[in-house]
Amino acid sequence: MLKGRNLLDPMDFSLEELEEVFKLADEIIEEPEKFLHVCDGKILATLFYEPSTRTRFSFEAAMLRLGGQVIGFSEPNSSSVAKGESVADTIRTVGCYADIAAMRHPKEGAPAIAAMYSDIPVINAGDGSHQHPTQTLTDLLTIRSLKGDLSNLTIGCCGDLKFGRTVHSLVKALSRYKNNKFVFMSPEELKIPDYIRKEILEKNNIEYKEVSKMEDAMAELDILYMTRVQRERFFNEDDYVRLKDSYILDGEKMKYAKKDMMVLHPLPRVNEIAYEIDQDPRGCYFKQAKYGMYVRMALIAKLLGVR
């Protein structure tokens, strides 16, 4: 039973519990009209201390399509946070009005602190460069739906692997499935963190390698997970400008790829995927965005215990 649980890290749910969420998402995709009123009378609070388009809209659309309502803020300056209110006090107050909360915060661990003080389920909608578990559920549902399996895959992760919380969460999650391998492509300054390399991959004897050129790995990949270099994580603008266009996926590089490879991206993109890839059937990032709404619908329904 997932009722009343928090989702702070992709490892919080067992593989069986994840499959439970995915099966419900499948049902919602097949017959959405059956779920139009399952959250009647329920309220989701979206507590976004950082800018967001897809994640916030996806959560809000998910709750509305389940028949529930949404309250919240999209920037801290529009709430009592601007007056210095703590995360603990904010979630305690919000718990008086809402049944479930989704929180995005620039500080790592902030949603976990909120969960400690909360009487309602808390979903981590991204905390700093740490984790983004609902994006991971989105990615897993997309791969599962389009590939048919989450095992025996070679996954390439490209771009900002140091600050990219979506990559950290995805590697952790896919490491739990059988016979998956990873290829990491990034500038030296933005390499995958040591804790992912040592505590997740090496500790569990999971095969991985790091390459400097995309072309060196494209032919073996089943999934290519592109990420942008995140301007908001840099203190030095010169460093950002120097690194932002390090890896760009275009039609020429796609010539090296398998016919059934999938290109994913958590979005927003900047320059790292050329617009010509939008016309390539292997470009699955907008399908991925839609799967994000469905998996959040399933997650909300499970945590509230209405399904």
Swiss-Prot record:
Record's keyword terms, sorted: Pyrimidine biosynthesis, Transferase
MF terms (GO), sorted A to Z: amino acid binding; aspartate carbamoyltransferase activity
Broad EC category: transferase
EC number: 2.1.3.2
Pathway listed: Pyrimidine metabolism; UMP biosynthesis via de novo pathway; (S)-dihydroorotate from bicarbonate: step 2/3
Residues given in the record as carbamoyl phosphate binding sites: 54-55, 104, 132, 135, 267-268
Binding site for L-aspartate: 83, 165, 228
Coiled coil: none
Database matches in Gene3D superfamilies: Aspartate/ornithine carbamoyltransferase (3.40.50.1370)
Catalytic activity: carbamoyl phosphate + L-aspartate = N-carbamoyl-L-aspartate + phosphate + H(+)
Gene Ontology terms: biological process: 'de novo' pyrimidine nucleobase biosynthetic process; 'de novo' UMP biosynthetic process; amino acid metabolic process
Protein family membership: Belongs to the aspartate/ornithine carbamoyltransferase superfamily. ATCase family.
Complexes and interactors: Heterododecamer (2C3:3R2) of six catalytic PyrB chains organized as two trimers (C3), and six regulatory PyrI chains organized as three dimers (R2).
PANTHER family for the chain: ASPARTATE CARBAMOYLTRANSFERASE, ORNITHINE CARBAMOYLTRANSFERASE, MITOCHONDRIAL
Role this protein plays: Catalyzes the condensation of carbamoyl phosphate and aspartate to form carbamoyl aspartate and inorganic phosphate, the committed step in the de novo pyrimidine nucleotide biosynthesis pathway.
Name of the protein in its database record: Aspartate carbamoyltransferase catalytic subunit
Organism classification: Bacteria, Bacillati, Bacillota, Clostridia, Eubacteriales
